[in-house]
Regions:
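Class I S-adenosyl-L-methionine
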Residues: 36-53, 63-276
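A structural signal for well-ordered alpha-helical segments within the folded catalytic domains
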Residues: 11, 15, 85, 112-116, ...
């Protein structure tokens, strides 16, 4: 999320929080994030150093609202919200002109009252009044590569006008527009030359000036080995786009005289018991003529490349999140949570979009239609209204290789 704000000529001065997650990666990319910031993390929010700032921004865990969480861990009383509460209390101590965090849209649709209480919490700590804006957006609509509906909680000094431009796309990219030029490159942590001379217009600006890119390597764990075993039997063309692992595995077993591939033998009784129905979160193959889907923290274990017989790589994940190819990955190769970083991050384009809206507001030049007043100093900006999966698919993805709107 930080890079999108920095792209709007903002300066980061501090990274802090309850979770020291991903900071190793940020430290390796000071050439893009600036070199004037400090980082300090503590379970005790009272230890977070307060500095003068115009904006406090954050990305606390969404698990308290996410449909991926079980009912016992989801809702207004979820323990995961402790991180958001800590964020609010810290923001109140800083007393900035604006505060923003990103979450899934259920935080608004199911937890609007909680969102208002967060504003009240900031006001109580800071002694300042803030106007609350609920901002709904979709990463694909605002210039990103994935169909990713999300929610930005935005609080600005009371009376400060805030709005955001609702984009009207003329074209939208497909996944191979984003990662196609990386597909056939050898896998390595080290820097290597691009092998595809002509990237799509969607990512041309993301390629490095020196023609070298690092971090194009995936996992080699048991999950990756099992996927490779399936491909070794059914072939690359034997696994169709949107096809799940259970279906591909059954095809492999049938072609292998009823025998499970070697790496699958130990779990074969469970697979048979479930009739090859491996559940909602099993690996599946993305379609090459489709948009990028949402990356989760387990993407490198669960996303099978659209055209290559393998799981996706770190660099491909970074690309899909809008990060430039000079975003250093290799230096963080020993960071145990590196694979989870990509799916836990806010896409650069979505961060850039909300960052620009905040900068325009702070500069006294808000853009876009006025927000809808829905409560006491409470507003709604419903940017992705009507931008449904059905609408996007019909408008831009109904023909196999067509990317322009009808």
């Amino acid at each position: 999320m930080s890079l999108g704000f920095i792209q709007n000529d903002m300066k980061m001065i501090q990274r802090t929080g309850t979770l020291n997650f991903g900071n190793v990666v940020a430290e390796s990319n000071r050439h893009l994030l600036g070199d004037d910031w400090t980082s300090e993390f503590s379970d005790d929010p009272n230890e977070w150093r307060v500095q003068k700032a115009d904006i406090v921004m954050g990305c606390p865990p969404c698990s308290g609202w996410s449909v991926w969480s079980g009912p016992a861990n989801r809702g207004p009383d979820s323990k995961a919200h402790e991180h958001t509460v800590a964020f609010m209390k810290y923001a109140g101590r800083v007393k900035p002109r604006a505060i923003v965090f990103e979450c899934v849209q259920q935080a608004y649709t199911q937890g609007r009252d909680v969102m208002v209480k967060y504003r009240d919490m900031v006001e109580q700590v800071s002694g300042k009044k803030y106007d609350l804006y609920h901002v709904k957006e979709n990463n694909l609509q605002v210039g990103g590569f994935s169909y990713r509906p999300r929610y930005f909680w935005v609080a600005v000094e009371s009376g400060l006008k805030f709005s955001a431009v609702t984009p009207e796309p003329k074209e939208l990219p497909r996944i191979m527009d984003i990662i196609g030029d990386l597909a056939e490159m050898p896998q390595t942590w080290n820097k290597q030359k691009y092998t595809a001379p002509s990237p799509s217009k969607w990512v041309k600006h993301l390629r490095t000036k020196n023609g070298m890119v690092d971090g194009h390597i995936g996992k080699t764990n048991i999950h990756a080995q099992r996927i490779e075993e399936i491909f070794s039997i059914i072939g690359n063309d034997g696994w169709e786009g949107n096809g799940d692992t259970g279906g591909a595995l059954k095809k492999a077993v049938d072609l292998n005289d009823g025998k499970f591939p070697q790496k699958w033998i130990d779990i074969s009784p469970r697979v048979i018991r479930k009739n090859f129905k491996l559940g909602f979160s099993q690996p599946y193959r993305w379609k090459e003529d489709h948009w990028c889907n949402v990356l989760t923290g387990s993407a490198l274990d669960h996303v099978i490349h659209p055209t290559q017989p393998r799981l996706i790589t770190h660099r491909e994940s970074a690309r899909m999140q809008g990060l430039p190819d000079d975003w250093n990955i290799e230096e963080s190769r020993n960071y145990s949570h590196l694979a989870a970083v990509w799916g836990k991050a806010v896409p650069v384009q979505a961060a850039n979009w909300i960052g620009k809206a905040l900068k325009d507001a702070l500069d006294g030049n808000p853009q876009g239609e006025p927000a809808e007043l829905i409560g006491d100093r409470e507003y709604l900006i419903d940017s992705d209204k009507g931008f449904s999966r059905h609408y996007a698919k019909k408008q831009w993805y109904s023909s196999p290789m067509e990317t322009s709107a009808k």
